[in-house]
Amino acid sequence: MSKFFTNFFVSAKGIFKKASTVQKIALGLIIFFVILALVFLIGFSTKSQSIALFGVEIKDQYLLDRISQRLDRENVKYFLSSDGRIYLDDEKLAKKMRAILVREELVPVHMDPWALFDIDRWTITDFERSINLRRSITRAVEQHIVALDDVDAVSVNLVMPEKALFKESQEPVKASVRITPRPGSDIITNRKKVEGLVKLIQYAIEGLESDNIAIVDNSGTILNDFSNLDGIDRIDLAEKERKLKLKYEAMLRGEIDSALSKVLSVDRFMIARVNVKLDTSKETTESKEYAPIELQSQDPKASYNTRKVSDSTIISSQTQKKEYQGQGYSPWGPPGQEGNTPPEYQDLSDITGKYNESQEIKNVALNEKKSTSEKEPARIVGVSLGIFVDGIWNFVYDEKGDFVIENGMRKREYKPMALEEIKNIEDVLQSSFEYKPERGDSITVRNISFDRMNEFREIDENYFASERFKYFLFIASIVFSLLILVFTIFFAISRELERRRRLREEELAKQAHLRRQQALMDGGDDIGVDDVVGGIREGDELQSNAELLAREKPEDVAKLIRTWLLKNA
């Protein structure tokens, strides 16, 4: 290897001596730039990279200022990017400051709670791991609660004691939660939402019981103390009963409208009142019945009764009989002494007696049937209806068959509804829903004249307006017809006068032309100036008449010229 390097340097030295000055300068520059590039690459690769303090951007400006102040107190150099991220130069220093900030809870809210365990240090202890676990669980629960629509902010504090050797000595896990309700939320008074929040916290933390959870609002009121919500529950129950009552009444009102609209027009009846009485109490009934035991069922093919029943079935029986017959004996006292038997019994001592006893015990089984019925908590116990029905309004006519006008309106007569029709309406209403008179249901239908004055006035105003418009159209049509007739007559007379004038002018022109021809034929000397001037004047007048006729009726003039050309041809 040493020989190789020796030969390499010898050959390089020989080549360098043989090279020209320009080549030597170029080679030196190349070597210089290569060395400079190597130095730059080595310096760049050994330079420490910026380490992000947290993997997420810090959007809260107040939190960002607190973190910056804490880093300044530790005399740490850091770089703040435009997106709210903090970068440090040393990775070890970043881990140290991250642990300090986590301990002082200066961590972004939207940061992953379990990112605390991404901190790798050789010197981390079990105590620090338990603290990190508690903080991660706390932050996870806070993020879970803040995600609810009814919570604006939350603060969770967990007490997780160390595991004891004996179960009896183990302290329970406890949690205190302070929430800030969102404006417009009813989580403070809504028991179901509070219970859901308790379940959410209980299931998120291992070993936590619902009795060890305290949830308060900003004023310090305990929300999960349900003993204070009994009054609110009663109010909610009353509100639900009211809404249910209104729902039943609306349904019944719709059924009545549907039933009455089939026999009456909508404007002829009015539902004055629909009252539904509800019983929301829960009622459970237990009954016990004894029925005969069926020994043989009814034969479906037999026309007579083949069914055999028994009141009971004997399970066991016991019969006992006792009989005794003999002389009764009344004992006396000691010998030589009179006994204590009363005198009335001493006379019966020599009478023979007879005793019979008969006893029969039977154990029977009865056909016993027990039933338990539970009524629905919301049932209708009474319905009362009040309905007004209007009669019929008919117009009043005079002897000529025209409307009778009274006070600027057409006169009307009211015809009340017959009692039979009212009874039919009540029958229709009774069949439209579950009508039960035994539970106190009542339906009242009364015939009352509705106030229709404004309605009639509007109808009559429209009627009179339409009549006036019809009369105006009639007069206008007559006037228009007369105008058309006048214009037609005027146009016909004008045409006739024009036709006569043209005929007269043509006749005069023809006579003048004949006179001129006659004069020319007679020698021409006798033609006077008046005849020539008159002929010129008549020719001009004839030309003007021809032009006027061509303007008024160009088609007739064209036909006349066409005919004249054909004749001359």
Swiss-Prot record:
GO MF terms listed in the record are: cytoskeletal motor activity
Q: Which residues cross the membrane?
A: 25-45, 473-493
Ranges of biased composition (kind: Basic and acidic residues)? 281-291
Which BP terms from GO are recorded?
A: bacterial-type flagellum-dependent cell motility
Q: Which cell locations does it reside in?
A: Cell inner membrane; Bacterial flagellum basal body
Identify this protein by name.
Flagellar M-ring protein
Membrane topology per the record? Multi-pass membrane protein
Key words, A-Z:
Bacterial flagellum, Cell inner membrane, Cell membrane, Membrane, Transmembrane, Transmembrane helix
Which organism is this protein's natural source? Borreliella burgdorferi (strain ATCC 35210 / DSM 4680 / CIP 102532 / B31) (Borrelia burgdorferi)
- Tell me the gene name: fliF
Briefly state the protein's biological role. The M ring may be actively involved in energy transduction.
Instruction: Summarize the subunit comment.
Output: The basal body constitutes a major portion of the flagellar organelle and consists of five rings (E,L,P,S, and M) mounted on a central rod. The M ring is integral to the inner membrane of the cell and may be connected to the flagellar rod via the S ring. The S (supramembrane ring) lies just distal to the M ring. The L and P rings lie in the outer membrane and the periplasmic space, respectively.
